[in-house]
Amino acid sequence: MFLQCLSTASAKNSLDLNDLPAFAEKYLRIQDKQMRTVALRLNSIQRRFLRERTGRDVVLKARQVGISTVEQARMFWRARTGSVSTMTLGKDEENKTRLRLMWQGFRDNLPPELQVKPKYDNAGLITHSDTGSYQVMNVAGPNG
């Protein structure tokens, strides 16, 4: 259902479903530093990361440049446009919750015609009943 609605919307707006930056700007919303809900417009570092990532990347000390945001957006986009299993590890419970709320914000701020109620939606698991995708959220380390 989501893909059918998205394909219809894409055809009307000439939006390439393989183009994460365009998808993000059109459909994904985040909270900015002033706590306003705004469109996700990828910055130059985020775009470069998407272009050059290998799939085996480890990002060290990349704070405040948007890597967590672009990775959550990429996983959400992949979960909504195909069938994938993704995992997010937060450094602690607070970080995991913040990342989970970002994912929830992506979903809750989609246009109504693109929203799909998840089969499961709790602190550790979000499923997408229409694509079969799921997102596992946990805490890294011995307490996770």
Placement of each model-derived feature along the sequence:
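Phosphate/NTP-binding elements of NTP-utilizing enzymes
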Residues: 2-144
